[in-house]
Amino acid sequence: MASAAKGKILAVIGDEDTVVGFLLGGVGELNKARKPNYLIVDKQTTVQEIEEAFNGFCARDDIAIILINQHIAEMIRYAVDNHTQSIPAVLEIPSKEAPYDPSKDSILNRARGLFNPEDFR
């Protein structure tokens, strides 16, 4: 029997409610270096900690998608905008306190720029 290739995982950066929801869904994992694939952001979390976690998740080869609350992505917008690799994909998601605003999603805006609206008529 052939062994299955190891799959890639999600990473989550968000408020406690968002991250706990995903952890309850089974996405929490520690890598070989005992580093988690999530960061809970609260009032005491610094922008530097958020940016380090984001860059760390981008550098990991076991992560395929990074989910980040949009209001937290705004705090490190320069880092999110500088990420141009397709993997890991970065998806901005709403939180309980901050609804999703498509106009602030730089990745969505970049994707819109790839297509001509006339192509969809």
From Swiss-Prot:
Keywords: Hydrogen ion transport, Ion transport, Transport. This is Probable V-type proton ATPase subunit F. One of its GO terms (biological process) is lysosomal lumen acidification. Disruption phenotype: RNAi-mediated knockdown results in increased protein aggregation in the oocytes of sperm-deficient young adult females which is not eliminated by mating. Subunit of the V1 complex of vacuolar(H+)-ATPase (V-ATPase), a multisubunit enzyme composed of a peripheral complex (V1) that hydrolyzes ATP and a membrane integral complex (V0) that translocates protons. V-ATPase is responsible for acidifying and maintaining the pH of intracellular compartments and in some cell types, is targeted to the plasma membrane, where it is responsible for acidifying the extracellular environment. Required along with other vacuolar ATPase components for the removal of protein aggregates which form in immature oocytes in the distal gonad. Belongs to the V-ATPase F subunit family. GO terms for cellular component: membrane; proton-transporting V-type ATPase, V1 domain. V-ATPase is a heteromultimeric enzyme made up of two complexes: the ATP-hydrolytic V1 complex and the proton translocation V0 complex. The V1 complex consists of three catalytic AB heterodimers that form a heterohexamer, three peripheral stalks each consisting of EG heterodimers, one central rotor including subunits D and F, and the regulatory subunits C and H. The proton translocation complex V0 consists of the proton transport subunit a, a ring of proteolipid subunits c9c'', rotary subunit d, subunits e and f, and the accessory subunits vah-19/Ac45 and vah-20/PRR. Transmembrane segments: none annotated. It comes from Caenorhabditis elegans. InterPro entries: ATPase_V1-cplx_f_g_su (IPR008218), ATPase_V1-cplx_fsu_euk (IPR005772), ATPase_V1_fsu_sf (IPR036906). Pfam families: ATP-synt_F. Gene3D superfamilies: ATPase, V1 complex, subunit F. The lineage of its organism: Eukaryota, Metazoa, Ecdysozoa, Nematoda, Chromadorea. GO terms for molecular function: proton-transporting ATPase activity, rotational mechanism. PANTHER family: V-TYPE PROTON ATPASE SUBUNIT F, VACUOLAR ATP SYNTHASE SUBUNIT F.
